[in-house]
């Protein structure tokens, strides 16, 4: 089973939407969101709306899709602390590396927040990637400032020798000035391919998804 870690240039860049689109595009694929904050109680259990989308799409138990759940809608390390818990990045890494799902050929692992979001007092998603070496798919929320955010993310990948499989342009605002020019700028400056594009909540448009 191939595994990909889906991260983004920012919070609310559209990771969950794009991840769901990838699962729709690829047969025999599934998605999980191992850590989620901002959960609410429903039927006597904590539920995160993003993880619930994956669970409903995959028809997997919520405990498989989202084993680490916390209440407050803040950074995972703060939300866990507020719940009297802590996140062990090694346990998260082991879970994501060892999870086996019948008939699934591609597993998309959605992170919470961006690459440098703290999971505990020492570790971030970057440390998770150093442990697992799972290749990354970068979701770029196309908005003002995205070029800077994306190039900074690329710098972190390169310094830490993290493999990025490619990036997806998630077009959030149909009124964004010079949208196509922004995408072209990123294509010229990034060292990994543009895999796909999504337009304002529409279906994913394949550009280079066959490389996954």
Swiss-Prot record:
The active site is at 33. It is found in: Cytoplasm. Substrate binds at residue 37. Its main location: cytoplasm. ATP binds at residues 12-17, 50, 110-113, 170-171. Keywords: ATP-binding, Biotin biosynthesis, Cytoplasm, Ligase, Magnesium, Metal-binding, Nucleotide-binding. It is an enzyme of class 6 (ligase). Mg(2+) binds at residues 16, 50, 110. It catalyses: (7R,8S)-7,8-diammoniononanoate + CO2 + ATP = (4R,5S)-dethiobiotin + ADP + phosphate + 3 H(+). Pathway: Cofactor biosynthesis; biotin biosynthesis; biotin from 7,8-diaminononanoate: step 1/2. Its cofactor is Mg(2+). HAMAP family: BioD (MF_00336). NCBIfam families: bioD. Homodimer. Catalyzes a mechanistically unusual reaction, the ATP-dependent insertion of CO2 between the N7 and N8 nitrogen atoms of 7,8-diaminopelargonic acid (DAPA, also called 7,8-diammoniononanoate) to form a ureido ring. This is ATP-dependent dethiobiotin synthetase BioD. The gene is bioD.
């Amino acid at each position: 089973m191939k595994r990909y870690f889906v991260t983004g240039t920012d919070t609310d860049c559209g990771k969950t939407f794009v991840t769901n689109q990838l699962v729709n595009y690829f047969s025999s694929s599934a998605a999980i969101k191992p850590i989620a904050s901002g959960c609410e109680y429903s039927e006597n259990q904590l539920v995160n709306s993003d993880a619930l989308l994956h669970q409903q799409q995959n028809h997997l138990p919520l405990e498989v899709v989202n084993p680490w759940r916390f209440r407050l809608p803040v950074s995972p390390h703060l939300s866990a602390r507020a719940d009297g818990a802590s996140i062990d990045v090694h346990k998260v890494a082991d879970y994501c590396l060892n999870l086996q799902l019948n008939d699934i050929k591609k597993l998309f692992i959605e992170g919470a927040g961006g690459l440098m979001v703290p999971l505990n007092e020492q570790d971030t998603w970057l440390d998770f990637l150093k442990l697992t070496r799972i290749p990354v798919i970068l979701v770029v929320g196309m908005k003002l400032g995205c070029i800077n955010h994306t190039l900074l993310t690329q710098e972190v990948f390169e310094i830490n020798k993290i493999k990025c499989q490619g990036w997806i342009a998630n077009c959030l605002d149909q009124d964004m000035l010079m949208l196509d020019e922004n995408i072209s700028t990123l294509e010229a400056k990034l060292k990994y391919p543009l895999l796909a594009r999504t337009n304002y909540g529409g279906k994913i448009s394949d550009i280079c998804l066959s490389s996954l």
